[in-house]
């Protein structure tokens, strides 16, 4: 490949540290697609003959068939997927294989391959996220009016509906989809034809290869084209944000499945047992999703540190761009699939959710709001009165709506029997009818919008 410049071959350790074929073999489909587009363009531009181009294309198809059936053989002497493919092509078709690399460098070749791979990865993630959103919306529609406690600081705060809670995750995933879509749009420029860094003297048609590979256009600066790994960082940053959202939902399932909470029962198919404690049903799938989020964030940090301070154009450091992306994608795909399965099959224990909502004085804010609306008391004063009522209820060991009217009047004489209409969890939830609030009608309206966007009937 480049031996003409050197008087001796690489040391064994150099061969090992230099080789990327053990991991970049995952790019074989993209590498062959890029090569076929490149040779078709070379023929059109009369840089290679039609006969040689046809032979090269046929040979590439044969190599692809071998890879699909047998996998990519790992030979450190061949260094990377590009040379492995070109080497096998030469074995199959002979001399014409040597013309494939005309007007191309491995710098623009790998930049193209990697963009194609990340684009495919984004499309795969998008399909998984749609399935997760469908699961969330479907379960939310079953529980649009099911009351549960809303929390702040993991303390009971105000009643909400389970449907409202699940739709919060739908919104998070919608933002994640938007981030991946933005990343896809930015990466969809083709660097092929930038060559090593300065472009090429051959009369190539970069627009042709860009179109053939499904890119919107060729990139506009050859130096940037071979140096750029923003698209990989964009993917990892979007993946990290998504993994944080999945981790939050996983954490809630873990907490909710514990005996003190008892809000959910995770199915056996997403749980494991204990080697010593026969009674255990451990939420291992959720815990692994939570754990994977840390590894995905680590992958993002790894590539950030690799790219920090690199001069233009290509440096060998950039060979380490692919392992963190591959690892993050594999972990993310597993996490999305596992979380979708859990959402689809988890059993929500509605009576326990309601019971928990009725504890912890979750309607205290409703008492304060009632004092503002009905008794025309400034909110800060109403807040103080309500705090006194909560302290009394806590001392007596009863809920706010179980305090006798005499006790409430003793706190403030402006309170009357009408206050009890505001103190039930159902009344509290129904009153939160502002746009985007937890009132069942609002939740159902947001569910209907989500179903329309996702193409869900009913």
UniProtKB/Swiss-Prot annotation:
Cited SUPFAM superfamilies: L-aspartase-like (SSF48557)
EC numbers: 4.3.2.1
Pfam family membership, one: Lyase_1
Keywords linked to the UniProt accession: Amino-acid biosynthesis, Arginine biosynthesis, Cytoplasm, Lyase
Reaction catalysed by this enzyme: 2-(N(omega)-L-arginino)succinate = fumarate + L-arginine
GO CC, alphabetical: cytosol
Biological process per Gene Ontology, one example term: L-arginine biosynthetic process
Top EC class for this record: lyase
Pathway: Amino-acid biosynthesis; L-arginine biosynthesis; L-arginine from L-ornithine and carbamoyl phosphate: step 3/3
Subcellular locations according to the entry: Cytoplasm
GO molecular function: argininosuccinate lyase activity
Source organism superkingdom: Bacteria
Family of the protein in this entry: Belongs to the lyase 1 family. Argininosuccinate lyase subfamily.
Protein name, per record: Argininosuccinate lyase
Lineage: Bacteria, Pseudomonadati, Pseudomonadota, Alphaproteobacteria, Sphingomonadales
Gene name tied to this protein: argH
């Amino acid at each position: 490949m480049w031996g003409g410049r050197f008087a001796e071959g690489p040391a064994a350790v150099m061969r090992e540290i230099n080789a990327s074929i053990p991991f970049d073999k995952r790019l074989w489909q993209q590498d062959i697609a890029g090569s076929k587009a490149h040779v078709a363009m070379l023929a059109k531009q009369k840089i290679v003959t039609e006969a040689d181009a046809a032979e090269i294309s046929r040979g590439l198809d044969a190599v692809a068939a071998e890879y699909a059936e047998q996998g990519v053989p790992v030979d450190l002497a061949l260094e990377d997927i590009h040379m492995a493919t070109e080497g096998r092509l030469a074995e199959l078709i002979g001399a014409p294989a040597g013309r494939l690399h005309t007007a191309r460098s491995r710098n623009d070749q790998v930049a193209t391959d990697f963009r194609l791979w990340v684009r495919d990865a984004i499309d795969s993630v998008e399909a998984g996220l749609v399935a997760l959103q469908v699961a969330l919306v479907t379960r939310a529609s079953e529980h649009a009016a099911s009351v549960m406690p809303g929390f702040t600081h993991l303390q009971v705060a105000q009643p909400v509906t389970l449907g409202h809670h699940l739709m919060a995750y739908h919104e998070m995933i919608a933002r994640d989809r938007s981030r991946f879509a933005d990343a896809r749009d930015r990466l969809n420029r083709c660097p092929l034809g930038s060559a090593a860094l300065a472009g090429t003297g051959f009369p190539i048609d970069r627009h042709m290869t860009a179109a053939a590979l499904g890119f919107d256009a060729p990139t506009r600066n050859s130096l940037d084209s071979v140096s750029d790994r923003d698209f990989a960082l964009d993917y990892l940053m979007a993946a990290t944000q998504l993994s944080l959202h999945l981790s939050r939902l996983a954490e809630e399932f873990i907490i909710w499945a514990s005996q003190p909470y008892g809000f959910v029962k995770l199915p056996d198919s997403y749980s494991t047992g204990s080697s010593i404690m026969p009674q255990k049903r451990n939420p291992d799938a959720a815990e692994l999703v939570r754990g994977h989020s840390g590894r995905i964030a680590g992958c993002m940090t790894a590539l950030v540190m690799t790219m920090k301070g690199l001069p233009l154009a290509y440096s060998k450091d950039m060979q380490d761009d692919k392992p963190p992306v591959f690892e993050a994608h594999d972990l993310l795909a597993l996490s999305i699939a596992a979380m979708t399965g859990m959402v689809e099959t988890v059993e929500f224990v509605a009576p326990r959710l309601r019971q928990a909502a009725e504890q912890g004085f979750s309607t205290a804010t409703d008492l304060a709001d009632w004092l503002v609306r009905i008794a025309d008391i400034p909110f800060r004063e109403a807040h103080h009165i309500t705090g006194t009522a909560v302290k009394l209820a806590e001392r007596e060991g009863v809920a706010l709506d179980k305090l006798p009217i005499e006790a409430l009047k003793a706190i403030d004489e402006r309170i009357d029997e009408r206050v009890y209409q505001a103190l039930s969890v159902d009344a509290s939830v129904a009153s939160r009818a502002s746009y985007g609030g937890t009132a069942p009608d609002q939740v159902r309206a947001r569910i209907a919008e989500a179903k329309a966007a996702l193409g869900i009937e009913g």
